[in-house]
Structures are given as C-alpha cells and as structure tokens.
Amino acid sequence: MNLKEIHYGIEIETVKRTREQIAWAIHSVVGGTVRHVGIPSSYDPWEVEDLRGRVWKVVGDASLTSVPAHLRAEVVSPVLGYDDIPQLQEVVRAIRRAGGKINSQCGIHIHIDAAPFDGRHLGNLAKIIYKQEPLILHALGISRDRLNRYTRPVSDELIQRIEQHRPRTKDQLNRIWYGYH
C-alpha cells in the first residue's frame, strides 16, 4: 500500500471570525466561487467551490461556546490527497491571516479513507492508538472536560473485543465496534 494514495478529509474548528470571513480566506487560496447556502439560524453554511469543482464548507459549530455564535466556524474540506497537503497548509495560513483563531474548545477531525484497509489493519490501528493515546492526549493538552464530552478515549472494552475476535474484514470490525454491520 502506498500511503501517498490514501484520501482524507479534515474538519478544522476556529473562532473569532464569521463563517463568511473564513470562506473568503479559503477562496483566497483555492479560487472558485463563494456562496452562502443556508440560513443564519442553523449551521449558517457557506461553500467555496474551488477551481477543480471541489467544495469546501464552512459551517457553525455549537460546541464552541466561548464566543458568540456568529464567530464560530468549522471548515470541512473536500476529499483531499497527498498532493493537496501544501494547499491545505496555505488554507490554514489564510484563515490565520484573516484573524481566525483557535482556543481550548477548538479541535480538528481527520477522516481517513478506509478503502485500502481491511479489518485486521484497522483493528491494529485501533490498538496502536490505544497504546499511545495517553502520550498523544498529554502532548496535545486535551482538557478533561473535552475528554469527557467530545474526545472520548478508545475504550478498554473495544480493544478486548478486537483482541478476542481478531476481525479480518471491515464488516467484522463494524460488528465489534458498533454492534451491527
């Protein structure tokens, strides 16, 4: 498996700027068109369709309670690949230049395409994360409140079930993890 062929998406939470300001910051890097696609009373979504037809979304995030609702934004990238890393870095820099900030409530979520992996690979990944999780959480300075609410650690029970059943397929892992396929 070539790691450079894996696709991913990322969600980045930011505060101190409106979703419109964040959308225009993204546009300054990716080009294309910016449009307001929602109503302010919901997630107030904005979209930036880049020059390649991919859509970057900027939505509200109710978990960022330390700032007024209009200054909470979550950037949702399109599906990206290895070659998009430099552009993603430029998007983050543009958001920072526009005044977007992070605070202790902000987080990121990285979604990795599971297609190249089977149940054995993903089970092993879960076990590696589980073993290194205390170090990762300490290095990132994750607050106890966030751990209790949003960033839940991998459970002992899940790892025990993975070790007991040793899944070979994603369907088997889904049944272990979620209790169904």
Where on the chain are the PLM-derived regions?
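C-terminal accessory/tail domains of diverse enzymes
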Residues: 1-102, 115-181
